[in-house]
Design a protein with these regions (language model features):
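A broadly conserved amphipathic alpha-helix scaffold signal in soluble, globular proteins
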Residues: 56-63, 77-80, 100
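An active-site-proximal "capping" alpha-helix that borders the catalytic cofactor pocket
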Residues: 8, 49-64
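Divalent metal-dependent phosphate-bond-processing catalytic cores, especially two-metal-ion Mg2+/Mn2+ enzymes
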Residues: 1-21, 67, 84-174
């Protein structure tokens, strides 16, 4: 999952250039690294989605490491919104959302220069990612069946993951 998070950072940075956005780079980096920290986490009676649970943990991380309120709030919002069906408002939230959706299902791959994709994919291995992520999503959908993640899973996330052009690149390189 760490390589997924790092790829998200790389893809988010590329999308920032393409989309003409100027995110808070530190907040975006932290959000990218921590966005799946609660995927499959224990039950939480208050939060109905791992993204919201993870947002709280990521915000706490920023505060514990002397981050300012603004950064903590951006990280929280960015992590909380990364599973939204539509791209959320706000530079950081939009960039992580689109990067995570690209890495998982290939969404927006045509927006990127193929060389950029080659560099990222050759630098940060995705071997085993689809199986690991699918396993975690199954757990997540059982723990929080009303969550956005569970709804996306039931709506065909796994076939979209298997059809991801990035995932097919791994298979063809073996």
């Amino acid at each position: 999952m760490l390589m997924h998070s790092v790829r998200c950072w790389q893809y988010a940075s590329a999308f920032a250039v393409i989309d003409g956005l100027r995110p808070d780079r530190e907040a975006l980096y932290v959000a990218c690294l921590l966005h799946d920290i609660a995927l499959g986490a224990e039950q939480n009676p208050v939060a109905g989605c791992f993204a919201v649970i993870g947002a709280g943990r990521a915000e706490e991380f920023v505060r514990r490491h002397e981050g300012d309120d603004r950064t903590a709030q951006i990280v929280h919002e960015t992590v909380a919104r990364h599973m939204d069906v539509e791209t959320p408002m706000g530079s950081e939230a939009a960039l992580l959302h689109d990067a995570a959706h690209l890495d998982v299902s290939g969404r927006r791959i045509r927006d990127l220069d193929p060389h950029c994709v080659d560099v990222i994919e050759s630098s940060y291995t995705r071997e085993g990612f689809a199986a690991d992520f699918a396993s975690r999503m199954k757990i997540e959908s059982r723990r929080r069946p009303q969550s956005t993640a569970a709804t996306l899973w039931r709506s065909g996330m796994y076939p979209a993951m298997k059809a991801n052009p990035l995932e097919r690149r791994v298979i063809s390189s073996k």
